[in-house]
């Protein structure tokens, strides 16, 4: 039986989730909520969604909604995740789940008490391209791991964009840099210390962010992210005996891993698959008890802890050691 979902907000990111949802029978989008009934109604009609609510609490009061997808501004992620969990709903919350490790950890406490699933939505983690990359590194294909370098940026020119508002926890690190942090952690483990620089825009939000991270065994991580830079989207994993390069590591639209070794280049191509569909299917299977969630508490808390440390390093202008 498909899991009955409600969508909290009418954000643009929903389009990608809805496209993935149409490809699977694991879920059904039953309801959508916005801050006002008219907006929710128009959205529901445009997307063939049965129920529309003018207010998020109204959606949470619907007894037939089993799970919610939260795509609200970053500053509201933890708050509404907790409210949804307390209302008895399972929660798939868009990344980043939170900027505070303590807040994220507390949200998982609520999930545990309520017997509900909470998962952070990093869709790229579900894609076979990502899983193949991890396998290649783990198998020693490039020898001992030495460096993880990545970038994610685009030129955001709309001053009204919520991603450019400090009060809503926008910014380069929270919006796109979080992918780079997640990817480095996936490959190299948890950072031991970090250093960072940021460039602030008119609202005091970081429009450019660059960081260096030190991992165990002398592995170095470096990334840069931006909301006012030309579009860049890449991940490079360097070992003592080779390099793995991805020119679309996060969206995974045309999955391909380039292996550079011994002066030769091998292109490992994979079949394209919708990451959002895979994410939704894993979430639903975990709800039904037929699979474990790919992303859980430990990963989400560690991700928030790294982001906290990176912001602190940028603000202080010095290296920050993680406990």
Give residue spans per PLM region.
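N-terminal Rossmann-like dinucleotide-binding module
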Residues: 1-47
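C-terminal helix-rich "cap/oligomerization" subdomain common to oxidoreductases
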Residues: 1-2, 67-69, 105, 268, ...
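Hydrophobic residues in well-ordered beta-strands that form the structural core
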Residues: 53, 92-93, 118-120, 149, ...
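Rossmann-fold dehydrogenase core element
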Residues: 105-124, 143-146
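Beta-loop-alpha module in the N-terminal Rossmann-like domain of NAD(P)-dependent dehydrogenases
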Residues: 47-110
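Predominantly a Rossmann-like dinucleotide-binding segment in NAD(P)-dependent oxidoreductases
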Residues: 124-197, 202, 317
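Contiguous beta-strand/loop segments that form the cofactor/metal-binding neighborhood of enzyme cores
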Residues: 182-252, 270-273, 280-291
């Amino acid at each position: 039986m498909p899991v009955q979902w409600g969508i909290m907000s009418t954000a643009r990111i929903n389009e990608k989730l809805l496209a993935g949802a149409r490809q699977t029978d694991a879920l059904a989008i039953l309801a959508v909520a916005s801050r006002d009934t008219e907006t929710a109604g128009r959205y529901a009609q445009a997307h063939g969604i049965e129920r529309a609510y003018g207010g998020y609490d109204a959606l949470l009061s619907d007894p037939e909604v089993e799970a919610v997808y939260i795509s609200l501004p970053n500053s509201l992620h933890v708050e509404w995740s907790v409210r949804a969990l307390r209302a008895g709903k399972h929660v798939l919350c868009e990344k980043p789940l939170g900027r505070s490790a303590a807040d994220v950890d507390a949200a998982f406490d609520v999930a545990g008490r309520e017997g509900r699933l909470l998962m952070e939505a990093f869709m790229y983690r579900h894609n076979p391209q990502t899983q193949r990359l991890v396998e290649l590194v783990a198998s020693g294909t490039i020898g001992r791991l030495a460096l993880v370098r990545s970038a994610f940026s685009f030129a955001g020119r709309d001053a009204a964009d919520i991603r450019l508002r400090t009060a809503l926890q926008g910014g380069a690190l929270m919006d796109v840099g979080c992918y780079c942090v997640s990817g480095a952690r996936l490959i190299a483990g948890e950072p031991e210390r970090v250093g960072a620089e940021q460039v602030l825009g008119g609202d005091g939000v970081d429009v450019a962010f660059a960081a260096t991270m030190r991992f165990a065994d002398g592995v170095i991580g470096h990334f840069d992210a931006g909301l006012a830079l030309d579009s860049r989207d890449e991940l490079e994993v360097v070992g003592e005996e080779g390099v793995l390069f991805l020119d679309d590591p996060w969206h995974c639209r045309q999955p391909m891993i380039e292996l550079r070794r011994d002066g030769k280049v091998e292109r490992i191509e994979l079949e394209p698959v919708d990451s959002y569909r895979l994410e939704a299917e894993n979430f639903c299977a975990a709800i039904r008890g037929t699979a474990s969630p790919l992303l859980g508490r430990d990963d989400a808390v560690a991700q928030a802890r790294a982001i906290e440390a990176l912001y602190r390093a940028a603000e202080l202008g010095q290296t920050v050691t993680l406990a």
